[in-house]
C-alpha cells in the first residue's frame, strides 16, 4: 500500500516557522575564537524542532523549505559593530499578531476525523485503510436537503424563503404590504373550493397565470387587493375564482330560502360594455356549474329586459353576481331594479381606465351604496357571509393619484401585487414605426394596405386590429379595406350595442379577420390570436398606445405592432423613447434625431 501524501496543513505549519535571531554575544561564544575562520563565519539561523514526525519525505521537504528560507535572506559576513548596530533588533511575536491566525475558523474539524491525532503521521492513523479518502465532513450547508433542488421538485412544506424568492422571480411577482401570503404554485395548492377546481380542470385551465398565483391566496384570506397588471394577464379569473369561492361559503339556508331576487352578493365594475360582456361570459361559464346566476348591466339594453332576466332566474333565487358599467348601474339602483344592501364583495377591473373615462364620481357613489365596513363581525350578515369587513379587489395598469385616493378611502390594509413589467415595453411584441415627415393621407392609406396585405400573406389566419382616433376615420378605413378585398368590421361609439356585439363575434370567429376601432375597443377586449395591431393614428395619450398594442402578443404568443406617426404626435415622442429604452427595445433612428423642443 502506497504511503499517504502529507497534509497540506502540516506542510504550511513547517513553512510558517519563524527563524530565531541569535544575538552577537551568543554568536561570539559559539565561534572558534578570533583568528579561526572568524572572517568567514556566517550568521546561523536556528529553527525550533517540529514535534510532528513526517517521515523521510517530510524531512526532505522541511530541509528544502528551510534552505529556501535561508536562501532568500542574504548571507552576511561579520562586520564591525558600528555597521551592524543599526540593524540590531528582535521580533517578539504573539499568535494574535499573526495576520494568518484565526482563533475562530469558518469550519472546525476534529483531528481524528482527518486521521491525525496528537500530531501522528497519516500512515499511523487508527484505521490505516484507503477508505479514509472518503471523509464525511458533516457540513450542515452541504447536507441540508431543503436547500438542494429547484422549488418545482419540492413539497410545499419543504419550500424555503430562498425558494419563494426564486418562485416570485420566475413568475415576475412583486408584492407590497404586511404579512402577505405566498403565491400558489398550482391549482391544487390554491385552497379553492373542490367544485371550482373541478371546473378549472374541465375547462382546460392547467396552471394559474402569475396574477392568479399571487391574487388568489390573498383574496381567500378575505383581504383587500390592489393588482397592477396589464390586460391579458389573466385578471378576470384572478378575481372571479375567489369571488365564486366566497359565494360557495355563504350560509346555505340564506341562499336557498332568504335571499331576495334583486339583491346581488357581488359586484364587478368595468369601464366599457365590451369588457363587461367578456367578464359576464367567463362568470356564466363557471356559475352554471356552481349554481350561481350572473347578470350584466350595460348601456344599449332596455331596463325592462334586465328586470325580466332577474325574474326568470329560477335557480338560486335571483342574481348573485352583477357585472356592469358605473353609469348604467347607478341608473338601475335609482330605478329600484337592483339593491346592493347585501353586496359585500366589490371588484373594480381596469380602475384607471374608469377614472380616465370620467367615472370617478360614479365610482364613489356606487361604493357608498354598498354596506359599510364598520362592526360587520358583530352583525347577522357577518355570520351569514363569514366576513368581518367588505372585501374589495381593484385591478389597474397604473397607480395614479385618483387610484391612490380611492385606495385610501375605501380599501382596508390592502396587499399590492405587481406582475411582470406592467407599464414596461412588452418583450413579445415586435414594434415598428413609420414616421411621415409630411402629412399625406393618400400615402398613409397606401402604406396601410401594403402592411395588412403583407401580413396576411405571411399569416393566412391572422387577426388584425387597426386603431384610429376618430369615428369618421374608422369608416373611411373600412371602405378602403373593402375596396382591396380585405373583409373587416368596425366598432366605435356611434354603433349600437347590438351592432358592436355582432361585429366582435364576427371578428372572433374569423368571418371578418380585420377589426377597425377607436379606443373604445383598446382596453378589456380579450380576443385570442391577434397577431398584428396597427395604429393608423397615434393615440393622444401615450398610455393608450400601450393598451392598444397589448391586444397582441398574449398568452406567451409573439405579436407585431405597426404605428404611423407625424409631427402632430410630438407630445408622445419623449415617453415613447423612454418606453422603448426601458424595455431594451430598438429606438428608431428618426426618434433619436428628432428635436423634441
UniProtKB/Swiss-Prot annotation:
Residue ranges of domain Helicase ATP-binding in the record: 216-417
Keywords annotated in UniProt: ATP-binding, Cytoplasm, Helicase, Hydrolase, mRNA processing, mRNA splicing, Nucleotide-binding, Nucleus
Subcellular compartments: Cytoplasm; Nucleus
Coiled-coil intervals: none
Gene Ontology CC annotations of this record: cytoplasm; nucleus
GO biological process terms, semicolon-separated: mRNA processing; RNA splicing
Annotated GO MF terms: ATP binding; ATP hydrolysis activity; nucleic acid binding; RNA helicase activity
Source species, domain of life: Eukaryota
Family: Belongs to the DEAD box helicase family. DDX23/PRP28 subfamily.
Protein name, UniProt field: Pre-mRNA-splicing ATP-dependent RNA helicase PRP28
Primary gene name: PRP28
Amino acid at each position: 500500500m502506497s504511503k499517504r501524501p502529507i497534509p497540506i496543513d502540516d506542510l504550511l505549519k513547517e513553512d510558517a516557522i519563524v527563524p530565531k535571531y541569535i544575538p552577537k554575544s551568543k554568536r561570539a561564544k559559539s565561534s572558534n575564537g578570533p583568528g579561526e575562520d572568524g572572517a568567514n563565519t556566517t550568521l546561523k539561523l536556528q529553527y525550533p524542532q517540529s514535534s510532528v514526525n513526517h517521515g523521510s519525505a517530510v524531512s526532505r521537504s522541511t530541509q528544502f523549505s528551510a534552505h529556501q528560507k535561508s536562501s532568500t535572506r542574504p548571507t552576511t559576513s561579520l562586520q564591525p559593530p558600528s555597521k551592524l548596530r543599526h540593524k540590531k533588533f528582535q521580533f517578539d511575536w504573539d499568535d494574535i499578531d499573526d495576520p494568518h491566525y484565526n482563533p475562530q475558523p469558518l469550519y472546525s474539524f476534529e483531528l481524528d476525523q482527518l486521521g491525525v491525532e496528537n500530531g501522528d503521521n497519516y500512515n499511523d492513523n487508527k484505521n490505516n485503510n484507503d477508505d479514509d479518502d472518503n471523509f464525511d465532513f458533516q457540513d450542515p450547508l452541504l447536507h441540508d436537503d431543503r436547500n438542494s433542488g429547484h422549488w418545482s421538485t419540492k413539497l410545499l412544506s419543504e419550500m424555503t424563503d430562498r425558494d419563494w424568492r426564486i418562485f416570485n422571480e420566475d413568475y415576475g411577482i412583486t408584492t407590497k404590504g404586511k404579512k402577505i401570503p405566498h403565491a400558489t404554485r398550482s391549482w391544487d395548492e390554491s385552497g379553492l373550493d373542490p367544485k371550482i377546481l373541478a371546473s378549472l380542470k374541465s375547462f382546460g385551465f392547467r396552471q394559474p397565470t402569475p396574477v392568479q398565483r399571487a391574487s388568489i391566496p390573498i383574496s381567500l384570506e378575505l383581504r383587500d387587493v390592489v393588482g397592477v397588471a396589464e390586460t391579458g394577464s389573466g385578471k378576470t379569473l384572478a378575481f372571479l375564482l375567489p369571488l365564486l369561492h366566497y359565494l360557495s361559503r355563504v350560509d346555505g339556508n340564506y341562499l336557498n330560502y332568504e335571499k331576495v331576487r334583486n339583491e346581488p352578493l357581488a359586484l364587478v365594475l368595468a369601464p366599457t360594455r365590451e369588457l363587461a360582456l367578456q367578464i359576464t361570459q367567463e362568470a356564466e361559464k363557471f356559475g352554471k356549474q356552481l349554481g350561481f346566476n350572473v347578470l350584466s348591466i350595460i348601456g344599449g339594453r332596455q331596463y325592462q329586459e334586465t328586470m325580466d332576466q332577474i325574474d326568470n332566474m329560477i335557480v338560486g333565487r335571483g342574481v348573485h353576481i352583477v357585472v356592469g358599467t358605473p353609469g348604467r348601474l347607478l341608473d338601475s339602483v335609482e330605478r329600484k331594479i337592483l339593491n346592493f344592501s347585501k353586496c359585500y364583495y366589490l371588484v373594480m377591473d381596469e380602475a384607471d381606465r374608469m377614472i380616465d373615462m370620467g367615472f370617478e364620481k360614479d365610482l364613489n357613489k356606487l361604493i357608498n351604496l354598498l354596506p359599510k365596513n364598520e362592526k360587520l363581525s358583530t352583525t347577522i350578515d357577518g355570520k351569514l357571509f363569514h366576513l368581518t369587513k367588505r372585501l374589495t379587489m381593484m385591478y389597474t395598469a397604473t397607480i395614479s393619484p385618483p387610484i391612490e385616493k380611492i385606495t385610501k378611502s375605501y380599501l382596508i390594509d390592502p396587499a399590492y401585487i405587481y406582475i411582470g413589467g406592467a407599464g414596461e415595453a412588452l418583450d413579445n411584441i415586435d414594434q415598428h414605426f413609420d414616421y411621415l415627415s409630411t402629412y399625406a393621407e393618400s400615402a398613409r392609406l397606401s402604406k396601410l394596405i401594403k402592411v395588412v396585405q403583407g401580413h396576411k400573406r405571411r399569416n393566412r389566419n391572422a387577426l388584425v386590429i387597426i386603431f384610429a382616433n376618430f369615428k369618421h376615420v374608422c369608416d373611411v378605413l373600412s371602405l378602403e379595406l373593402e375596396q382591396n378585398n380585405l373583409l373587416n368590421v368596425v366598432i366605435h361609439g356611434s354603433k349600437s350595442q347590438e351592432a358592436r356585439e355582432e361585429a366582435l363575434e364576427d371578428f372572433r370567429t374569423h368571418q371578418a379577420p380585420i377589426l377597425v376601432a377607436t379606443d373604445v375597443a383598446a382596453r378589456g377586449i380579450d380576443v385570442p390570436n391577434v397577431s398584428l395591431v396597427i395604429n393608423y393614428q397615434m393615440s393622444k395619450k401615450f398610455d393608450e398606445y400601450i393598451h392598444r398594442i397589448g391586444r397582441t402578443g398574449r398568452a406567451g404568443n409573439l405579436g407585431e405592432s405597426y404605428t404611423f406617426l407625424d409631427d402632430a404626435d410630438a407630445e408622445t415622442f419623449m415617453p415613447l423613447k423612454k418606453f422603448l429604452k426601458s424595455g431594451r427595445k430598438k429606438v428608431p433612428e428618426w426618434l433619436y434625431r428628432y428635436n423634441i423642443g
